[in-house]
């Protein structure tokens, strides 16, 4: 298992076309936003 640490407003890139953005961290809750092409199933 790969564990990554990121702060709010940082992002993780998966390949060239998928971005995972850390929107907010509130205690143990993390809000993420995923930006990917339509043909990629999330």
State each model region's role:
Residues 1-42:
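Compact, glycine-rich, soluble single-domain proteins
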């Amino acid at each position: 298992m790969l564990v990554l640490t990121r702060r709010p407003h940082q992002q993780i890139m998966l390949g060239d076309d998928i971005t995972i953005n850390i929107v907010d961290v509130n205690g143990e809750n993390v809000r993420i936003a995923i930006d990917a092409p339509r043909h990629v199933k999330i």
